[in-house]
Amino acid sequence: MKKNGGSIVNISSYSAKDPSISFPTSSTIKAGLSAFVKLFADQYSKDGIRMNNILPGFIDSFDVSNEVRSMIPMKREGRVDEIENTVVFLLSNKSSYVTGQNIRLDGGLGFSI
């Protein structure tokens, strides 16, 4: 990758920025990954290597209760294809100037907590 450049996309969680007392270890690890992506980008972007994190909220691949759904400003869980489309974009040359980012895909959950 160092020879030809490339893109790395990590799937993290909204809890990287909005930790949950229910999942303290996971939230801490995800926060560490959020910091790491910035350090990695600083070190390797000059070599054409990009790294970004996706921070999904509640996604339809899991059962989401009506109570949780009501907390999401968009009033629905995300779809797997919405995550997929973002990954495809970040791996493509269309995002060639995007690196070191933590991209929330959470239906606005992050700004409502």
Protein language model regions, located:
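Helix-to-beta-strand junctions that scaffold the AdoMet/dcAdoMet cofactor pocket
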Residues: 1-4, 45
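Short C-terminal tail/terminal secondary-structure segment
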Residues: 18, 88, 99-113
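Conserved SDR Rossmann-fold cofactor-binding beta-strand/turn motif
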Residues: 50-60, 91, 104-106
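Active-site helix of classical SDR
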Residues: 29, 37
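Active-site "substrate specificity/gating" loop of NAD(P)-dependent dehydrogenases
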Residues: 19-23, 45, 64
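A conserved structural motif in NAD(P)-dependent oxidoreductases
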Residues: 72-83, 94
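Residue(s) in the substrate-gating loop at a strand-loop-helix junction
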Residues: 13
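Alpha-helical segment proximal to the catalytic Tyr-Lys
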Residues: 42-46, 96
